Regions:
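A composition/biophysics-driven feature that prefers long, compositionally simple stretches
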Residues: 4-185
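Generic secondary-structure signature for well-ordered alpha-helical cores
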Residues: 119, 150, 178-188, 192-199, ...
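Short aromatic/hydrophobic contact patches that present stacked aromatics
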Residues: 129, 191, 228
Length: 255
């Protein structure tokens, strides 16, 4: 683990002050809901609270917010520790790394270590808010917390962080405007390349290329969802992805 601590800089797209403002806003909402400790599993909320945004959400990870803490904690697997050190604004000691031995090694689970961390900090009797409907917060995650912390008062946080994210800062709005410019270019490419006789996958390739290239000022990256391109009778099913079939004249296409 120590090798990651020599990384010389953090690559943050928001200032430390903005992250601190977000934390204070979330902590105020926690107080209002009677939550002393928040375990946030939603990958977007983890990013909002810490800056961490690696593509690692498919396995257990979370941000942990104590109602009186100066920083949240970021709980990630060892393989992804470097990403947390690079992308988050947190001090090294607030990045908590669990061993790879917990991966696919049932009945062991990363939240076994999370429970131990909570006990070590004497938080096991607190009122703990959980994101009960968050993607990838599995039933097993919940069971580990429930069984491991029998004296805690567990409650649904009711999308607390999601509501905090609702009001955007000037910097966030600026980034959204940049993203809109990239989306506009992607839509123009789609209008240009979708024609009868063209394969759907070829059109998607051009659209993705445009989205990744971005603008002269802002580069793009992968989109938040696969490029959906239902066409013909597929337009009755909104979330179909492209195939190698060709576009047919007179058929509708959803971009």
């Amino acid at each position: 683990r120590g090798i990651w601590k020599i990384i010389p800089c953090q690559l943050m797209i928001f200032t430390r002050e903005e992250y601190q403002h977000r934390l204070k806003k979330v902590q105020k909402m926690m107080q209002e809901k009677g939550i002393e400790l928040l375990i946030s599993h939603d990958t977007n909320n983890i990013n909002y609270l810490t800056g961490y945004d690696a593509w690692s959400f498919y396995y257990a990870q979370c941000a942990i917010v104590h109602v009186n803490a100066e920083e949240p904690l970021c709980f990630v697997r060892a393989q992804d520790a470097g990403g947390a050190y690079i992308k988050s604004y947190l001090k090294n000691e607030n990045i908590l790394v669990y061993d790879e031995e917990y991966i696919h090694n049932w009945p062991s689970h990363p939240y076994d270590q999370l429970v131990d961390i909570i006990k070590e900090r004497n938080w096991e009797k607190l009122s703990i808010g959980l994101e009960m409907d968050a993607h990838y917060f599995t039933a097993y995650c919940y069971e580990k917390i429930k069984l491991g912390l029998p004296n805690a008062k567990l409650k649904d946080s009711e999308r607390l962080v999601n509501w905090a994210r609702l009001v955007k800062s000037d910097t966030e709005i600026s980034y959204m405007k940049s993203a809109a410019q990239i989306s506009e270019r992607g839509m123009k490419t789609a209008m240009d390349v979708i024609n009868p006789g063209i394969r759907q996958c070829d059109a998607v390739g051009e659209i993705q290329k445009t989205l990744f290239r971005g603008t002269e000022e802002f580069g793009g990256e992968y989109s938040s969802i696969a490029t959906l391109l239902p066409t013909g009778k597929g337009t009755s099913a909104s979330h179909l992805t492209a195939t190698q079939d060709k576009f047919v004249e007179g058929e509708a296409t959803i971009i």
